Design a protein with these regions (language model features):
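Non-catalytic DNA-recognition/assembly elements of restriction-modification systems
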Residues: 5, 22-55, 67-68, 161-183
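Specificity-determining recognition surfaces
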Residues: 131-160
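Short aromatic-glycine-enriched beta-strand elements
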Residues: 59
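A short beta-sheet element
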Residues: 68-69, 79-132, 144, 155
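Single conserved hydrophobic/aromatic residue that forms the stacking wall/gate
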Residues: 1-9, 14
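Generic recognition of stable, solvent-exposed alpha-helical segments in well-folded globular domains
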Residues: 34, 39-43, 78-85, 122-129, ...
Length: 183
């Protein structure tokens, strides 16, 4: 909570509830955090989506988790779901479901990934920091007995506070600075 106070600054508020229309009824939703009055509150599904990527044929690098973690060399595949350098992809199958990777070069996503589409009105590092904040919760609430899958219902329904863009940039910068101190 103190880190949140540090990141938000002096504009703390007592807004820890909001109302949402569900099946035609207005329901009060209790929130895990307090949000400043200048922020709007949405669900993660309103600012990001999991997509399949563009189906393509032709040789390209397979961007699987081992390669993205630098634990294996690149393998070449003939077709797949194409993503571009600078995109973000998220593991949706396996024990590390919810882990996000930046795409280092054009190539084909590994079969355990989805492309993470982020709204252009959002500051990408802010949303990525938000998803990272919930990494353990996403990892520990997987679905499926044989191969666990990302709980997409939980993922899409996470409440996210949306500050003005300049505040998103400041918060993301502060989070980055704090992570540098941890390293």
């Amino acid at each position: 909570y103190e880190i949140l106070r540090c990141l938000v600054g002096s504009e703390m508020c007592i807004r820890d509830r909001y109302y949402e229309r569900i099946n035609g009824q207005t329901v009060e939703i209790e929130l895990p955090l307090e949000y400043p009055n200048s922020w709007i509150l949405l669900r993660l599904k309103d600012v990001c989506q999991l997509t399949d990527g563009e189906k393509r044929n032709g040789k390209g690098i397979c961007l699987d988790a081992k390669y993205l973690r630098s634990k294996s060399s690149a393998s070449i595949v003939e077709k797949g779901k194409f993503v571009y350098a600078g995109d973000n992809i998220i593991l949706v199958d396996g024990e590390n479901s919810g882990e996000v990777f930046p795409v280092p070069q054009n190539g084909y996503m590994g079969s355990t990934f989805k492309q993470l589409w982020l709204s252009s009105v959002m500051w990408k590092p802010y949303i990525l920091a938000f998803i990272l904040f919930y990494k353990d919760e996403l990892r520990n609430s997987k679905r499926g007995a044989a191969i666990p899958h990302l709980n997409k219902e939980l993922f899409y329904n996470l409440p996210i506070g949306i500050p003005p863009l300049a505040e998103q940039q400041r918060i993301a910068c502060q989070i980055n600075n704090l992570f540098q101190l941890i390293k």
